[in-house]
Amino acid sequence: MPLVRIGDRYVDVNIREELEEFEWENAKWTQEKLIASSPFRSSDRNPSFYIDLEGEYAGVFGDSGAYDTYYESGTLPKLLAYLRNESYEDAVDYLLSKYDYEYSNEDVILATPTPLDTSPRSHIMPEHLYAKPIDTEYLDGRGIHPKVVEMMGVFDNGNSIGIPWRDINGNVVAIKYRSKRDKTFYYEEGGAKLSELVYGLNIVVERGISRIAIVEAEIDAMTMMSTGVFAVAIGGARFNEHQADLIIASGVKEVILAGDNDLKGRQFNDKVAKMLRGYVELLTMDYSKYDGCKDVNELGTEGLRRVPLLNVDNKKDIRI
């Protein structure tokens, strides 16, 4: 395996194995390189993306057609952070914990956690980063109600929107920027890891909400909220014990599993169910009549109001 720089360490990484976890359009694999359509742009019909799999520049990627300079080039952690829908720091932790046997991250070791502890104060974002005009126009086009956008504090950031992530006490401890033009996103530097947070959970605690849906992405959560069902998001498809502890401690009684309508989404639902079973009542969305819909946002508010819910344990049809 090639030697790849991950954070401030060099480790042997099976780059091809990591990349084969994802679908690539117009992919051409060689021993040394992957050439494919850009994962950052759905409009890339002529492959403009490459990543070196071997050699001195193993793990380095480039995208000659990138709209955003942030994604013109970079290293494996940046690419995986995008593909896994997580922060750069979480991607680094993932790679080091998998490939560097000497690596130990104290932030990830959760010995008897106190679920409602706040994130470290050093992660609290300065107010000037997010005290900006609310952006309802972009998300209105995605079917999200303006009152939901305002409640979640989504703000205009020029060519992108800013999505604040708050800890259990409502402090903004991370900010995700999502491009208005394409699928790219990035995070404000110095923020907390999303693996330590649950998007929207502070409102669940503040308002004493007892019934929630769990989704992968923030926009899916806001879409669900626009139907009148509150939702929290994990920021990807990788649910962990710390996030489970936070949800259990929040006092919710009923959880709707609403991962994406694909294999990873079903695996996400299964993992959430495994960690929460016995603590809350579990329901799951029945996508059987909606095979063409990828996720909650694509299903839309009207579709969400019609989709059946099944009891996870006995598969009994539930009516809202």
Please report, for each region that a protein language model flagged, where it lies by residue:
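Short, non-transmembrane alpha-helical segments in secretory-pathway proteins
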Residues: 131-141
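Small-residue helix-packing motif on alpha-helices
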Residues: 88-92, 149
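Short, basic/aromatic recognition patches
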Residues: 141-158
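N-terminal single-stranded DNA-binding subdomain of primase/primase-helicase replication proteins
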Residues: 18-83, 155, 167, 284-286
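Phosphate-handling DNA/RNA-contact segment within nucleic-acid enzymes
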Residues: 157-251
